[in-house]
């Protein structure tokens, strides 16, 4: 439990209250705290859900046994959201040599800071922070902090929710507890997620009580490639929502679009512009999505209930900023104004697969997008993404499940995947080996990036410093081709949503030699694959494998073979068109007299491979990997067999390339040395 997590963002006055703990709190500490040698001698979290308010009480103590922990405890910060509740501090004490030093009684008060800790992530939440500068701490002290916070979310209209990770071993706690309670008559439901035993449960004085002793047992390890529902850490979710339909219905009042676009307003003008440009619904949707992505900056305003309450579309467009809710509502209003069937949906961008096993609460989600239904197909439109265009609008994000926001309520629906129509990256390479098997290979790489992958290159495309551009190209290509880049340019086609990187460079040591044969191992999207999910443990044998994606990579390589290479052979699998381990592989290779053409692609979307099919998947990938193409040249002309004139002629393009590096930065000694070596 980090020092700075003494109270979760809480929450309705702007002044810290110094009062006794709530009457319902049952203290856990029973002596021996000052003598404890655990780093966290005490951790007591108690939560009460009642009358639409969630109260969170925390009593925590730290043993300061090192200079590092002493420094960390020098300032204690308690944060809260004043639009939703209060922060109360009940105790701030130092236990030293059998004495109790009451810092609050001694007049210690915090500095109240209003700062946006997430501003670099474009997030404004109105958090206030009470920063206590603790005086006179010494090694061996025990610092004890007791506080509570209240949370009443205006968007939930009296409904309540609570979710928290459960502290597990190997975290060491001397005495630890997590206790939750609510009136027996309250319609509260709860669920534990992850590998954790059920809590003790009983009814007491008209309240239902759940109690965990902390830390709970360390969860059994899970394979990293398992679906997300298997990898959830221990946590508890509690809420007053009866089911997902209840969650959907409760949110729907905030996402109606009727009357949100003024008939003669700015948004109506944009709608008219799009309708005039095309009468094809999908093209209209793509244009509206582009407008929301490109012309409205992302900014989360969590103040005044903004974590769930959306900004009005007219305000979003006027300010040109908004979060996922604001962008989604703006996009939704525009689509409906154009007669396109659409609705807002809640998703979890971090672990969507776990939503299906979650307790129905709004907190199971962290993101909102729009689901449009056009010509029988669902399109999942994310206004916070970037670079989406008609060619990529059909790509399905990896969210797993979605909750439609409807006035009548709705259940979870799957975010069903489909194969993308356009590659995220198209790599075209001219690979010039004509100088010989001992010479560096000259190459020109022409790469197109689409969608969000392309949008990431916008900054580089705007750069004027050629040295920085070449550096960016070098960094990207070092794991694709390697070697040295000596010239590059980066552009971004805003209309197409495509970034283009064109680079010239040279690669080294592209051949291996054995008994007079030079071998070059062809690289591409379909080469160097492996598939080795570990299911050796008996507890893992029924756990499926989860693929990544969606991601589609296509490559086109054109080789200029070494001069006077009469005996060139191609081994390996020259054609592929199959689905293996959840990945589509395509390959076509053609060896000519002076050239070698290699075209291939891979595509995978999020899916699960049942444990029973993993053996077949391993064998399929092993077979594909064993057929990685290899070019073999028998009796190639070696460098020492060439005369000086031929060597000079063949090396001149390489020297010219090195000279371009010197032109970029003439005082770089390494560039001069490189050219000198050539």
Give residue ranges: language-model regions.
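A sensor for short, sequence-defined functional sites
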Residues: 12-664, 670-674
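Bacterial N-terminal signal peptides
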Residues: 1-8
